[in-house]
Amino acid sequence: MIPRNFFFTILICAFNVCATFTAVATASPDCIGPFASYALFAFVTCICVCSIVCLVINFFQLVDWIFVRIAYLRHHPEYRNQNVAALLRLI
């Protein structure tokens, strides 16, 4: 089974992006000054970039987990260690 932390990380990134876009959608540019609008734009950009980086790292971890699982399952059964498999959540 795929570890739950992959799903939690994806959900946290999606929640951050959605919450940020919701906050920006309700902000009126006529009511805030130029510095505040630039600060808001920088905040939104930072959250989006951090979420994308987090998703890329999560994707690489998932690919690594799949390759480790394939390499483990290709070994002969007598060389498989159940403790290692349980530790890596491979089975």
UniProtKB/Swiss-Prot annotation:
Residues 1-22 form the signal peptide. Keywords: Early protein, Host endoplasmic reticulum, Host membrane, Membrane, Signal, Transmembrane, Transmembrane helix. The keyword RNA-binding does not apply. InterPro entries: Adeno_E3B. It is a single-pass type I membrane protein. Its main location: host cell. GO terms for cellular component: host cell endoplasmic reticulum membrane; membrane. It is found in: Host endoplasmic reticulum membrane. The keyword Membrane applies. Residues 23-34 are lumenal. Residues 61-91 are cytoplasmic. It comes from the Viruses. The chain crosses the membrane at residues 35-60. Down-regulates the EGF receptor. Belongs to the adenoviridae E3B family. This is Early E3B 10.4 kDa protein. It comes from Human adenovirus B serotype 7 (HAdV-7). The lineage of its organism: Viruses, Varidnaviria, Bamfordvirae, Preplasmiviricota, Tectiliviricetes.
